[in-house]
């Protein structure tokens, strides 16, 4: 039983990245799909797709990791900020920058998932899901 599915997703991506795997499979959900979409738009992963597995009711989100031409990892780190035991909410002016703006903070707002830059631009606050650099 997984208590925090987003932390589990981040851990699977981090571990696969450390082992230089080409892809990683995580149980699928709408929130995880939204996070994968942001990671792809920001260039941290190369692609993602939803796969259905026979004899299972839940589909799988397959994330294709991205590496440089020299084989180095593009995604240096990924961290969960708001946890199920301690939710972190920030207003649009208090949204944190990851590594001085070099990374991306993922925020869940009333308008859906978005990056910290989009939230500041639209002047929307929300729950800080995690950060990527």
Curated annotation (Swiss-Prot):
Keyword Transferase carried by entry: no
Biological process per Gene Ontology, one example term: translation
GO cellular component: ribonucleoprotein complex; ribosome
Matching InterPro entries: Ribosomal_uS8, Ribosomal_uS8_CS, Ribosomal_uS8_sf
Keywords: Ribonucleoprotein, Ribosomal protein, RNA-binding, rRNA-binding
Subunit composition and interactions: Part of the 30S ribosomal subunit. Contacts proteins S5 and S12.
The protein's name in its UniProt record: Small ribosomal subunit protein uS8
